[in-house]
Amino acid sequence: GQRQRIVIARALILEPKFIFCDEPVSALDVSIQAQILNLMQDLQEQYGLTYIFITHDLSVVKHISDEIMVMYLGCTVERCSAKTLFQQPLHPYTKGLLSAIPRPVIHESKNDDDFLTGELSSPINPKPGCRFAPRCRFASEECFHKQPILKEFVPGHLVACHRIGSDIA
């Protein structure tokens, strides 16, 4: 936690407007994570900072973010407010990520259809089409040949998926 505080202090010396944070709390226990995240939020309010937060930990994302962009193998698949993402995800990859979050409620049923399966595509030599297609249970022929573009399906909610609005939403 002390190292993170020092790095934050060093970054603030330059009086930035944007701070890029790459896994800033990943190696910390939960109580120290909370302290660092609270410090970052306090500093954000005090100095009007904008954070670009890169992390794989969705609980951290939910705590710190106003807007979230989900990426898969270097491509944006979904972008919306944090509230919308956690309440109404649209992309199958986002749904899979959210279904993998451990829940404290023992008897709550998870939707097995959202679990991520299949082989990862090569990020170095990607095949044409949607990079998530080999792992997507909704993939159509189009998904394997044509890269989807990021489109606004509802105001403020952008998704890159050929199948949104068909049988997966």
Predicted features, each with a name:
Residues 1-2, 60, 75, 119, ...:
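Gly/Ser/Thr-rich helix-start
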Residues 20-28, 32-109:
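P-loop NTP-binding/switch modules centered on Walker-like glycine-rich loops
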Residues 2-5, 34, 121, 127:
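Conserved ABC ATPase nucleotide-binding domain "signature" region
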Residues 13-17:
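A short, proline-enriched helix->beta-strand linker immediately N-terminal to the Walker B motif
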Residues 81-169:
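Charged, flexible cofactor/metal-binding loops and thiol motifs
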